[in-house]
From Swiss-Prot:
Residues 1-38, 95-120, 133-166, 1005-1029 are annotated as: Disordered. A motif (9aaTAD) lies at residues 1054-1062. Residues 17-31, 104-114 have a biased composition (Polar residues). Its main location: nucleus. It comes from Saccharomyces cerevisiae (strain ATCC 204508 / S288c). Keywords: Activator, DNA-binding, Metal-binding, Nucleus, Phosphoprotein, Transcription, Transcription regulation, Zinc. This is Transcription factor PDR1. The 9aaTAD motif (residues 1054 to 1062) is a transactivation domain present in a large number of yeast and animal transcription factors. Positive regulator of proteins involved in permeability. PDR1 and PDR3 jointly control the transcription level of both SNQ2 and PDR5. PANTHER family: HALOTOLERANCE PROTEIN 9-RELATED, TRANSCRIPTION FACTOR PDR1.
């Protein structure tokens, strides 16, 4: 007879018949101190079968409980009564032994260790262990029986049976519960309780499901699916969450038809922008359906879904342009400027950096620089550039310095013309407009040249052990790319830089021995700058970092060493022990800002490796662990997060000088300059930004581990952190509104947007405690963006329209419009406050914001112009309008009456007014009323080409879309409707964002392009015939989203949901 013997001497033993979980969960206790197994007749019946007075088969769970879909429990009736009568002296030397069949057990145990858990930061339930049962499908959104018999070995998928481990745990839980129910807990009973709790804790720690590996090749629960997908099947939960928005349902057959991964690789595992992905939009849709009391979806809901979908048409088109910019920078720039034929050379500048062909392009771009403007701000003329053009390394360094000087001058220019109050230059003056155009023109030319020479330097050998100048150039370039929001190019250059700095040993102290200290400090600074950029990108994209912190042992920069931190490990372990001191306050603002940012990223990186990508919390085997095991992991996550937050708060205290400056109303009292005030404010935004990110990332881990019924403590913690995000958001609003220029508000939006998106994803919960003043501040931030008129006033100029700064501004403005709209709608619905009342309140108390609410809520207003104008599609979306027009697709989804109604309305132009708002709300800009679509004299643009796209017999589900298709550029379909009036655009033809055909080869199916072009030459009837005959030649994602009017008036959101998201979000 074997058993588990803890160190305190209490030993639990059972009889030889513990194979049955029912047998092992019922005990009778004699006065001798031994706990004996009761008669088999009693132990065969579970509690529910006893109540129903039906026969129980004694299995766990029993067949009757599975049929009734109820929890199967075996309580101790006789044993419980007898334990209460035990004399406390009779427990002396008590031994209770639990049989272990380690040879046949399905649970593999690592080396047993005694529980050494210290006091948790998160208070755990007092009856944690005894409150959980292990029966059936206890976790997941769709809990319930799968209707299979217990004897079915496939019920647990490829995981080995763990009934004996369940029996052991159930026995310990039952005994623990009975001991705690005793009227008087003496010393010996308390000791027994502690012993059993130790055994339970040890068992839960060592619970590791085993996989029947040999059967993976022969058995398939989901045909044609990956092994990872097969391992989702288990007996504990029907729904397996990988993120908050991505869930796999073992009962959802629709998922079997998809060949795409559940996790969208574009958004990664932990990106907060998952909310705006198709999965996130579907989750938002589901939440709205569950919370809305309307039988039909109001127009505002349809409009919101449309603009959220449309947002990615713009974003992914910009991503495609970034891919082209770094691959063929010179050709791409010259074509946009109409200086080259429309068909580019097949020779890439990256592939032949020193050819006469490439150098001739370099000369063309240099001669296209606006002079003497560039010489005035950089001090370098075209002739100087032409004389150095054959020296790649030298030319690369010169161009980087020019781009940096251009950046600083451009920022000062925009800060001056957007200063608040209105003492700025007149943005309509000819001189100001010409200067702005020159900045845009010069910036695009310089970045094209930098990309070209960066590609050239990849082919040069550099001995980095003696000369780190080129490494410094790469990090310099990364800083500029980050400022330009060139994310695609930034990622490519970063990969090269991290490879170089790692290869030459900058992260290891061993490579510094024997070096001159000044040279060694340069190397350290290079490493930590590369660390800064890499960790920032990993956090932004939600991917695991390429830098392993455990292998970093070089010293920290001088500022860290001056305050007592030698290396990364020293900092992580002791940061919370160091208080604010003169050593911090004596740092200059820029040094303290860099210290704070690098400190934050080290904490964030440590949290990522210890939780987000820790195998303990993300193992695929966790899907087949009982709820009590996963709940224990949940509390460990909360404990680690609380420890991380304590260290994070220490950084806030150490950098308190920056917080004091950022929140000060009068910076002159602190004797700081305008630049220092802006730097301090941006650090506070950076700090709050990463705190919100960590909370959001933790939410995804919680979704993975969460059981069906969340513990009250977990719910309380989630509410606390939601309030903290709300507090961060309100603080960020104050800082943004305190900037003295609108340009700084716009440039800080990257940090502000994270808190916005997290709050919007929890809009219905947050709206319950949001205040009217918060609504007003949010609208003020939107107004600050709206006041930056220089971009929209000059977008008809090709240099402005093609500039990266224009694209970045339009994305930020469109995104802010969307989140402001959602927050307003959620606030109005949750607070039962009519938005007209809020609008009236603002008119009376904040007259400078008059008309802004109407502007945001009216999708016909100029606020949505960048989203609603026809653009080249990314291929990310599907044409809902064509879905509804296609009879072959409609008939399976809609009833006969619905089909008749659709046919009746197909020829009508439906255009209902927006409830309680005037359609076509005018834009009020500083009191000047401008037409709704012709914004500042500019008509709505026409589509890029008048292509007709094919109609398809059916629309694929979301996960039948391939990622390569999602980012493919395509041409927009001509659309009609109020929001897309087909008027000849004032925009130059070369400003229509056309991407050369040969450049699209890696991203696009050329057959599809040829088919589209051929179809373009036929009349409408011929087009339809060709489309019907050759539909297989087109990608199923070659749809355009259509116009807003078509979507709102003809769209059926239930049909849309059933097609796009029914296989992503199982029905609750």
């Amino acid at each position: 007879m074997r058993g588990l013997t803890p160190k305190n001497g209490v030993h639990i033993e059972t009889g030889p018949d513990t194979e049955s979980s029912a047998d092992s969960s019922n005990f009778s206790t004699g006065f001798s101190g031994k706990i004996r197994k009761p008669r088999s007749k009693v132990s065969k019946a579970c509690d529910n079968c006893r109540k129903r007075k039906i026969k129980c088969n004694g299995k766990f769970p029993c067949a009757s409980c599975e049929i009734y879909s109820c929890e199967c429990t075996f309580s101790t009736r006789q044993g419980g009564a007898r334990i209460k009568n035990l004399h406390k002296t009779s427990l002396e030397g008590t031994t209770v032994q639990v049989k272990e069949e380690t040879d046949s057990s399905s649970t593999s145990f690592s080396n047993p260790q005694r529980c050494t858990d210290g006091p948790c930061a998160v208070e755990q339930p007092t009856k944690f262990f005894e409150n959980f049962k292990l029966g059936g499908r206890s976790s997941g959104d769709n809990s319930g029986s799968d209707g299979k018999n217990d004897d079915d070995v496939n019920r647990n998928g490829f995981y080995e049976d763990d009934s004996e481990s369940q029996a052991t745990l159930t026995s310990l839980q039952t005994t623990l519960k009975n001991l705690k129910e005793m009227a008087h807990l003496g010393t010996h009973v308390t000791s027994a309780i502690e012993s059993i709790e130790l055994q339970i804790s040890d068992l839960l720690k060592r619970w590791e499901p085993k996989v029947r590996t040999k059967e993976l090749a022969t058995t398939k629960f989901y045909p044609n699916k990956s092994i990872e997908t097969q391992l989702m099947k288990n007996k504990y939960c029907d729904v397996v969450h990988l993120t908050r928005y991505a869930a796999w349902s073992n009962n959802k057959k629709d998922q079997d038809t998809s060949s795409q991964p559940l996790i969208d690789e574009i958004f990664g595992l932990y990106s907060p922008f998952q909310f705006l992905s198709l999965q996130g939009i579907g989750k938002c849709f589901q939440n709205y359906r569950s919370k809305s009391k309307c039988e039909i979806f109001p127009r505002t809901a349809k409009e919101t879904i449309y603009i959220m979908l449309r947002f990615f048409d713009v974003c992914f088109h910009h991503i495609n342009q970034g891919c082209v910019s770094i691959a063929n920078p010179l050709e791409n720039y010259l074509q946009k400027m109409n200086l080259l034929p429309s068909t580019p050379s097949s020779i890439s500048s990256a592939g032949s950096p020193n050819t006469a062909h490439t150098k001739s392009h370099v000369a063309l771009v240099i001669n296209h620089l606006p002079q003497p403007f560039v010489r005035n701000i950089t001090g370098i003329s075209n002739s100087e550039l032409l004389s150095e053009m054959n020296n790649d390394i030298s030319m690369f360094g010169i161009l980087l310095k020019m781009l940096d000087m251009h950046k600083n001058s451009y920022q000062n220019f925009l800060m001056e013309i957007t200063s608040n109050p209105s003492v700025a230059k007149n943005t309509q003056s000819i001189d100001v407009l010409q200067e702005f155009i020159h900045y845009c023109q010069a910036g695009e030319a310089l970045i094209a040249l930098c990309y070209s020479y960066y590609n050239s330097t990849l082919y040069n050998y550099v001995d980095f052990t003696c000369d780190i100048t080129h490494l410094e150039q790469l990090l310099y370039f990364l800083d500029l790319l980050f400022w330009l929001s060139e994310i695609y190019g930034f990622e490519k250059v970063l990969n090269v830089a991290v490879h170089f700095v790692s290869r030459v040993g900058l992260s290891r102290w061993e490579f510094y021995v024997g070096l001159d200290e000044n040279f060694a400090e340069r190397r350290r600074n290079l490493w930590w700058k590369a660390f800064y950029f890499e960790k920032t990108l990993a956090s932004k994209l939600g991917y695991p970092s390429n830098i392993d912190d455990s292998k970093i042992n070089c010293l920290l920069p001088k500022n860290f060493r001056d305050v007592g931190f030698l290396d990364n490990r020293d900092f992580i372990e002791n940061v919370h022990l160091v208080r604010r001191s003169e050593a911090f306050d004596n740092m200059c603002i820029s040094d303290l800002k860099y210290y704070g940012e690098l400190a934050v990223l080290q904490i964030v990186s440590h949290f990522s490796s210890s939780v987000l990508f820790n195998e303990k919390f993300t193992s695929i085997r966790n899907t087949s662990k009982p709820s009590v095991v996963r709940e224990k992991l949940l509390f460990e996550v909360l404990e680690i997060f609380n420890e991380t937050e304590m260290k994070y708060d220490a950084i806030k205290e150490q950098t308190g000088k920056l917080f004091d400056i950022a929140f000060s109303k009068d910076s002159t009292e602190l004797k700081v300059s305008r630049e220092d005030k802006i730097m301090a404010s941006k650090f506070v935004l950076f700090y709050e930004h990463h705190f919100c990110r960590m909370v959001n990332e933790s939410d995804n881990i919680v979704a993975r581990l969460c059981v069906h019924r969340r513990p009250s403590i977990l719910i309380e913690n989630l509410k606390i952190y939601l309030h903290k995000i709300y507090k961060s958001w309100t603080d960020m609003n104050k800082i943004l509104l305190d900037f003295d220029n609108d340009y700084s508000v716009y440039r800080s939006f990257a940090h502000y947007s994270i808190s916005c998106i997290i709050l919007v994803s929890q809009a219905f919960s947050v709206a319950e405690f949001i205040k009217v003043n918060d609504v007003v501040n949010m609208i003020r931030v939107f107004k600050r963006f709206l006041d930056i008129k220089i971009f929209s006033e000059n977008e008809t100029n090709e240099h402005v329209f093609n500039s990266q700064s224009f694209k970045d501004y339009t994305r930020a403005f469109s995104f802010l419009t969307i989140v402001t709209r959602i927050m307003l709608l959620a606030y109005g619905e949750s607070s039962s406050t009519n938005l007209d009342v809020i609008s009236k309140y603002i008119d009376e108390n904040a007259p400078d914001l008059k008309g802004i609410i109407e502007l945001v809520l009216d999708t016909n207003s100029c606020a949505y112009r960048f989203l609603l104008e026809p653009v080249q599609k990314s291929g990310f979306h599907l044409t809902v309008s064509q879905m509804l027009k296609n009879r072959k697709f409609q008939e399976p989804l809609m009833s006969n009456e619905d089909n008749k109604q659709m046919k009746h309305n197909s020829g009508k132009n439906l255009n209902p007014d927006l409830p309680s708002l005037k359609t076509g709300t005018s834009c009020l800009l500083n009191g000047i009323e401008s037409p709704q679509l012709p914004f500042n004299g500019r008509s709505a643009p026409s589509p890029v080409r008048n292509n007709s796209l094919p109609e398809f017999a059916q629309l694929p589900s979301f996960r039948s879309l391939s990622v390569s298709d999602m980012i493919n550029p395509d041409y927009a379909q001509p659309t009609n409707g109020q929001n897309n009036t087909q008027v000849q655009s004032n925009k130059p033809i070369n400003a229509q964002q056309q991407i050369p055909t040969s450049v699209q080869v890696p991203f696009m199916n050329t057959n599809e392009i040829n088919n589209n072009n051929n179809n373009n030459n036929n009349n409408k009837n011929n087009i339809n015939n060709i489309n019907n005959n050759n539909s297989n030649n087109f990608s199923a994602t070659s749809f355009n989203l259509g116009t807003l009017d078509e979507f709102v008036n003809n769209g059926d959101l239930e049909d849309l949901y059933s097609i796009l998201w029914s296989d992503v979000y199982p029905d609750s």
